[in-house]
Amino acid sequence: MSNGVFEHSYASGSPDSAFYIGQCYPCKVILDDVTGAYSGLGYSGTNSGGDMYIVRSRFVHNRSGMSTTTFDIELYPPGRDTAIIGNLVTDSGLENEAAGFYATETIAGNGIALVGTHANLLERNYIARSRNNGILVLPLLDRHYWPATRHVVRDNTVVSSGRADLAAGGLGTLHNCFAGNRYRTSLPWGLEILNGCDGMRVPIASDLSADMTFFGSIAQVFTGSFKVVDYRTRPVPPPQPNMPGGPQAPVVPAVHPFEDHTLGLDSIPQARESP
């Protein structure tokens, strides 16, 4: 998909991705006020980016909340230049809740995972109750080695993660910065201190345990030891509001939907979880 907008949409119960954008650069795609639930991945973007925005959305009860990845098997690597702003990402990796299959299991349990991608922006998101990591930055080894680099992770709230709220792995995880985040735990320790956005960065500040968890998940896939949840058993989505005007609303051709959509990036609030 390129040059398009998903808005006010609900997707649930997919063994793969509730929402997926892949193989485009620049994509010119906006996801605004969407919900992805009970799926292998709430949002997945492979080899996508460039004028790419995911804003004001909810990704809940998925194997993995959101991921941007790079794979040699698809066109236009690496994934890069995606803005993820003001989203709610909760309850990622609870095995009895979300549908899934082998491909989604490799990064299960992470709220937002940036795997082998470049220059993404994570800002004002709220990530809670991830089984493994709230935010994970990790390189990827495919036919080529894809470092995770030049990401900006700032002003996010990350709570109640199983391993770490903020995690950076791999020896090639360089030139990423973390600033202004509200969190309790990080791997490695002092991630914001050693890799801040306005000061000195120490390139050795990464943690190989994140890589071991990733490779352990791959081993589970190859041995068939991960739990498969049938998508047909997932909760039926609740009634959703209809489009303005209902079936009688006038049909307007989407000639240039990306340009016509008002993003208002500076006015997007910090995402919060409803009480």
What kind of region is each of these model predictions?
Residues 153-156, 178:
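Hydrophobic, well-ordered secondary-structure elements that form the walls
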Residues 121-126, 157-160:
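A short, structured loop/turn motif at beta-sheet edges
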Residues 7, 74, 95-97, 105, ...:
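Glutamate identity and glutamate-enriched acidic tracts
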Residues 127-128, 132-137:
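Non-catalytic carbohydrate-binding regions of carbohydrate-active enzymes
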Residues 1-121, 136-150, 167-175:
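Right-handed parallel beta-helix/beta-solenoid
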Residues 160-275:
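Acidic, glycine- and Ser/Thr-rich low-complexity intrinsically disordered tracts
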Residues 129, 144-152, 160:
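Surface-exposed substrate-engagement region within the catalytic domains
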